UniProtKB/Swiss-Prot annotation:
Signal peptide: none annotated. The keyword ATP-binding does not apply. The gene is rcm1. It comes from Schizosaccharomyces pombe (strain 972 / ATCC 24843) (Fission yeast). The active site is at residue 350. It is found in: Nucleus, Nucleolus. S-adenosyl-L-methionine-dependent methyltransferase that specifically methylates the C(5) position of a cytosine in 25S rRNA. GO terms for molecular function: RNA binding; rRNA (cytosine-C5-)-methyltransferase activity. Its main location: nucleus. This is 25S rRNA (cytosine-C(5))-methyltransferase rcm1. The keyword Amino-acid biosynthesis does not apply.
Length: 460
């Protein structure tokens, strides 16, 4: 009985916005979290149906001590679970079984009324269906090997995806989409780290940096755990050394595991707060690129279960929490811009809020006038949705920003700003151009000397 009370309490906590389904289900070690999670999701999936059956049977009128959410989970398992009610004999079981005939009758009537044969047809449908994105880990594999290993048929759009189909993304290199029903976690490609499950939008920061021209030295990932973006950087820049910062001990372990699975041997994990590093340290003198994805509200994250919560889970962000997040985001971005040889920085969040996105970038750039937003042509031009000009200090800044709307284009809600230091970029260009010119002159001179030597030897 404790199990059903626990599930009912989670339903109550969800209505009070005390957490997500997953958080609440997996917080308790007393009950099987997977079983709890499944029952809560299934109950929510059929909530309108269960409520109608309970109302028409007058269950709560006749059993005044029975609470609404407990009635929902019990009636769900009585009518819809293959194993039925998993409950020992007692008052609650007797209470439900007393009304079994009436509940079953109302269930049958409802199916007839709706014109369906099975209860599955009565379930709530998810209006936002995201594909599962797989990043091909080029450290360990190739596109050809992965596609052959999946054994799926190619389609030309994510809308055409099905259990036996895949789609090659046209915006991010080495990224493919598959249907969520495909059992990828059981596939050897996933187990061996040859493919990494990573949302398309989450691939944008590293993809933006990879699309830039010019010299690339060392790279910093300032908020690295769980490691998807870090390992993406490692794959995009195999000749660069990557410093991956994470201050939380548990998340460091997650990061180490992810880096290990990916096979990235050009990553150094730094268990420390990135904002406490000394930008002028010799250790970071070769850093030219920085990727920042700091803590945020997560308001853009689309869970596959969000639709089950309906309007009950519409999030009105706590103003104080948002302000604290924005303060931290501004601090870490300002810190990143202090590295003396850094030329490119991407700042990203999985938030849809102006405060955490355009406002943070504009505020920091107003204090760091040597830094600018990059151009559209250097910021994944294939992705059409940019920053919001009205939110920017100068409308043109929006071109160097990327926005993703939750669910649109198969992504979560996301934001990326592509920042650069024009003077340092130009100086680096000149320096490496001069080096190239010097090398060319030396090669030319050497060729002349070789020819001259050969001619002299021929004359002798």
């Amino acid at each position: 009985m404790d199990f059903y009370n626990h599930a009912a309490n989670i339903l109550s906590d969800l209505s009070k916005k005390k957490g997500s389904i997953k958080q609440l289900a997996f917080n308790s070690k007393k009950h099987d979290p997977k079983r709890t999670y499944a029952l809560v999701c299934e109950t929510l999936k059929y909530k309108p149906v269960l409520d109608e059956i309970i109302a028409r049977s007058e269950l709560l009128v006749l059993e005044k001590k029975l609470k609404e959410n407990l009635a929902r989970v019990l009636v769900h398992d009585l009518l819809m679970s293959k194993r039925g009610l998993s409950i020992s004999n007692g008052p609650i079981k007797e209470c439900i079984l007393r009304h079994k005939t009436r509940l079953n009758a109302e269930f049958v009537k409802l199916k007839v009324k709706k014109g369906v044969k099975s209860h599955e047809e009565l379930a709530l449908k998810n209006p936002v269906s995201l594909p599962r994105w797989l990043r091909i880990n080029t450290i360990k594999s190739t596109k050809d090997e992965v596609l052959q290993g999946l054994g799926l048929d190619k389609v030309s759009s994510i809308e055409e995806l099905g259990p036996d189909k895949f789609y090659i993304d046209d915006c991010v290199e080495n990224l493919i989409a598959i249907d969520p029903s495909f059992p990828i976690v059981e596939n050897s490609l996933y187990k061996e780290g040859k493919v990494i499950i990573q949302d398309k939008a989450s691939c944008f920061p590293a993809a933006v940096l990879a699309g830039l021209t010019g010299h690339v030295g060392d790279i910093i990932d300032g908020c690295a755990a769980p490691g998807n973006k870090t390992t993406h950087l490692a794959a995009c820049f195999p000749k660069s050394h990557i410093f991956a910062f994470e201050r939380d001990a548990k998340r460091v372990q997650t990061l180490r595991k992810m880096v290990g699975i990916s096979g990235a041997n050009n990553v150094t994990i730094e268990h420390q707060d990135f904002t406490l590093t000394d930008p002028k340290s010799d250790l970071y003198r070769n850093v030219t690129h920085i990727l920042l994805d700091p803590s945020c509200s997560g308001s853009g994250i689309v869970s596959r279960q969000d639709y089950l919560l309906g309007n009950e889970q519409d999030v009105t962000e706590d103003t104080e929490r948002l302000e604290n997040l924005c303060s931290f985001q501004s601090t870490i971005l300002k810190h990143a811009l202090q590295f003396p040889n850094c030329r490119h920085v991407t700042y990203s969040t999985c938030s849809v809020h102006r405060l955490e996105n355009e406002q943070v970038v504009c505020e920091v750039l107003s204090q760091e006038p040597d830094w600018k937003c990059n151009s559209l042509t250097k910021t994944l031009p294939n992705w059409k949705t940019r920053g919001i000009p009205e939110y920017c200090a100068q409308p043109s800044m929006a071109e160097g920003m990327i926005r993703c709307k939750p669910g649109a284009g198969g992504t979560i809600g996301f934001f990326v700003a592509n920042l650069y230091h024009p003077q340092r970029e130009q100086e680096t260009f000149k320096m490496y151009k001069n080096d190239d010119d010097t090398k060319k002159r030396k090669r030319k001179k050497k060729k002349k000397e070789v020819k001259k030597k050969a001619r002299i030897q021929g004359e002798e």
